[in-house]
Structure formats: C-alpha cells, structure tokens
C-alpha cells in the first residue's frame, strides 16, 4: 500500500509540473502521522455498508492518538515492515537485493486499488500531501472523538453502524458526489 501512496504522490507532482523526484525521496517525506492517516482513510474508503471485503478486516487495531487514528500493530512494528526499514524518522525502501517478494491476495489488492482510486478522485477536497489537513480531517470524524475521550482509546471499527456513520461523515467532508 505504501508503494501505491508513493505512485499517487508522483502523479500529483507530475500534474503540478514539479521537478521529478525519486520514489525514495518521496518516501522520505512520508511521516508516520501521514502514513497512519492515509492508511485509515484508505481503509475507510474501502468500507461498504454491507458484508463484503474491506481493509478493516486486515488493519483492525486502530486507536485514537492525539493526531488521529493509528493502526497500533503497524505503528508498533514499523521497524519490521517488509521491503522497508525504519531509520528512526522515516521508512527507507530496501534495495531489490534485500527486498522480500510477497504475493498479495487478489481481494486485498482490488480493495486497496478501489479505495485509493476513490480518494484520488476527490483530489480537490482530499489533500493527501498535507499532514495537517489529514489530521484535522480525522478529528472531524465521530469515531476518533468517541475513542479519544474514552478510557480505552480503541476505535470501534467492528460496529457496522458506527463505521457506516463514519463513512457517511467522511464522504460529506470530502464532497462525494462533486
């Protein structure tokens, strides 16, 4: 999924006619906060109000941190992400010699592609480059508020009704339908 975020940023930079930047340089610009928000919003974009596959089935341990939802398992194990190494500040892509080839289930790949394409279509109201924007957007959603001010800080993503409300609010905020 990180690779898809890098591709997306490359597309944005080309549209803005910015100087060409390598994927490694783009990756260096991804803070953990930005990655966690993009992960959450990608999962949320994949959610549909019916039984089916969504990314919350894989990334299912979100907690409310001060700067928005964080997938705790990913955050805690960020130094062990396959094909990337964490140098204390940001992720670095491993060389092809060091990288581990992993096959991704087709349903997961399709879900990721659909969710990211959905977000890309909202480029006028969803600024994936701006970490502060992503944090503020996450703070406008009800699940973060409910969890942040509770004793557990756990986002209740297993509750379909809550997730449906979250998705509707998210869609309203990013102007779905425009």
Language-model segment annotations:
Residues 1-178:
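Domain-edge interaction signal
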């Amino acid at each position: 999924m990180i690779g898809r975020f890098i591709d997306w940023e490359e597309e944005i930079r080309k549209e803005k006619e910015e100087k060409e930047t390598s994927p490694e340089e783009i990756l260096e610009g991804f803070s953990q906060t930005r990655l966690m928000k993009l992960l959450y919003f990608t999962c949320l974009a994949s959610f549909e109000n019916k039984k089916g596959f969504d990314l919350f089935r894989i990334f299912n341990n979100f907690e409310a941190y001060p700067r928005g939802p964080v997938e705790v398992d990913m955050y805690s194990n960020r130094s062990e992400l396959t094909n990337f190494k964490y140098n204390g500040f940001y992720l670095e892509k491993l060389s092809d010699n060091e990288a581990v080839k992993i096959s991704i289930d087709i349903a997961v790949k399709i879900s990721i592609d659909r969710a990211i394409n959905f977000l890309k279509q909202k480029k006028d109201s969803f600024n994936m480059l701006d970490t502060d924007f992503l944090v503020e957007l996450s703070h406008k959603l009800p699940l973060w508020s409910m969890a942040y001010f509770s004793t557990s800080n756990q986002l209740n993503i297993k509750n379909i009704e809550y997730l449906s409300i979250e998705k509707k609010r998210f869609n309203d905020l990013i102007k779905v339908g425009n």
